[in-house]
From Swiss-Prot:
Gene3D superfamilies with a match to the protein in the record: 1.10.3730.20
Entry similarity comment: Belongs to the UPF0060 family.
Pfam family, one: UPF0060
GO cellular component: plasma membrane
Keyword terms: Cell membrane, Membrane, Transmembrane, Transmembrane helix
The organism's place on the tree of life at top rank: Bacteria
NCBIfam families for this protein: PRK02237.1
Membrane topology (UniProt): Multi-pass membrane protein
Entry protein name: UPF0060 membrane protein SH0717
Length: 108
């Protein structure tokens, strides 16, 4: 279980970080090198997600989606200095509950 959490967190950092670098390039007019580096990091995200131990693509990405939402809010708070409001927090909690429902039960 700790391995799965680690992979989710690493994938999230790559997806959010890579996307953020592309955002800086295209939306804020920063260097195209940031866009290139962001693209490479996003490719790493695609590879890292395959290290999950879950047997199916759909379940991995569905569960990861909830983790991505929470990590995006944390990123917004730390990097963009934008605190989540109560609706953001309620929505994130609902997502994490959904992730737990998907990944915690043992399946045969």
């Amino acid at each position: 279980m700790l391995y799965s959490i680690f992979i989710f967190l690493l994938a999230g950092l790559c997806e959010i970080g890579g996307g953020y670098l592309i955002w800086l390039w295209l939306r804020e007019g920063q260097s195209s090198w940031l866009g290139f580096i962001g693209g490479v990091i996003l490719m790493m995200y695609g590879v890292i997600a395959t290290f999950q131990s879950f047997p199916t693509f759909g379940r991995v990405y569905a569960a990861y989606g909830g983790v991505f939402i929470v990590m995006s809010l944390i990123w917004a708070y730390i990097v963009d200095k934008q605190a989540p409001d109560k609706y953001d927090l309620i929505g994130a909690c609902i997502c994490i509950i959904g992730v737990c429902v998907m990944i915690l039960p043992s399946r045969t």
